[in-house]
Amino acid sequence: MVPKKSAEPKLTVAELGRWRLVEQFQKRLAASAVGRAEHRSFADPKRQLQLGEYLGLFLFGLLNPAVRTMRALCAASDLARLQKEVCGRAVSLGSFSEAQAVVDPQLLEKVFTDLAQEGQEAKPGRAGGLPWRIVDSTLWEALPRMHWALWRRQGPTQSAVRLHVGLHVLDDQVDRAQITTGRGCERRTWRASWKPGEAYIGDRYYGEDYQLFGELGALGCAFVLRLREQASFEVEEELPLSAADEQAHVIRQAWVHLGCKKRYRSIRVRLVWVQTPKEVLLLVTNQEVATLSADLVAQLYRQRWQVELFFRWIKCILGCRHWLAESPQGVAIQIYLALIAALLLQRHLGRRPTQRMWERLELYLLGVATLEELEAGLARETARLERQAKTKKV
């Protein structure tokens, strides 16, 4: 069943400047919290900082270019406008820090999931008639004192947090997310998220366990995964190439079995060799040629750059390089809020903001740019992107 399209009105540039995004988030939070049990401390009459106020202030800190630390955020809560629109009262360091221990990150995960599903629509033109999703993960460096996030010991001890995502190719939108420590296995996390009938695109690490291919096939899932150059395989049948395949720089395709030993052998899969300026890519899929031609296999894998751009954007533009909370719950809260902010911005601007768009928004929020200059800057950047897209099509 296709989710109904949201009737929520599109925000104007001026409304973005008035932090209507925080207001929209708080409304969605309240809707998602219905029927869920809150921590008992929120029922205590002595508690002044409520759930929506805490998370709204946290989100404000992620979005605002002038706020980089928890101390700065709490100091800003003294401002009358911020109290009126976001947090209701001045918030002390102790109250803000303590709140992370009583907020369930699964509530934010639900807000994120509901928001992502709300924006998905059935669209024509899916390759092979399948909803392709790019899977990948990225690391955030954690502070040495965040011992729970121990990642590895290469020289000094290193701590990190890993975000695993699934990015819907046609919507260019992350609709799945899972947070683990840096040691969290990418394949294990991906496997836990499988759903029958879905289609996945992944890099080399996801293609290292050949036994997963049979499990994916049993679920009715399709995949396009990259293999390492050293992959061992036995050719069962060479396949011809079409003119479209050759135009997509496909140099060979064949049905093969992967694995050098019988116990490691994969099911029969189709291996596609794609020539790039630097190297030859080995791409594997379980789809028949009639369902997914070799040129489409190459084109699908090239879409992986979308998830890399998303990681760069959420880290650099949303400012997720500074931890406003350091516990496992606090870190999960910060990352889920960043993901929610990314979806809200993408929804209300009609696209994921580029770095130039985000810089202009920040200048406006700092009072350097006027509303007219903000609107003109966003219009120029949008026009540039449209011209760029037309040039690529030609």
Model features per residue range: what roles?
Residues 1-72, 89, 100-103, 110-111, ...:
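Single, function-defining residue in the core of a domain
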Residues 68-86:
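DNA-recognition alpha helix
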Residues 82, 117, 146-152, 183-184:
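Short acidic (Asp/Glu) patches
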Residues 84, 121-122, 152-154, 212-213:
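Catalytic micro-motifs at enzyme active sites that drive phosphoryl/nucleotidyl and oxygen chemistry
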Residues 95-120:
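Short, basic alpha-helical nucleic acid-contact segments in DNA-binding proteins
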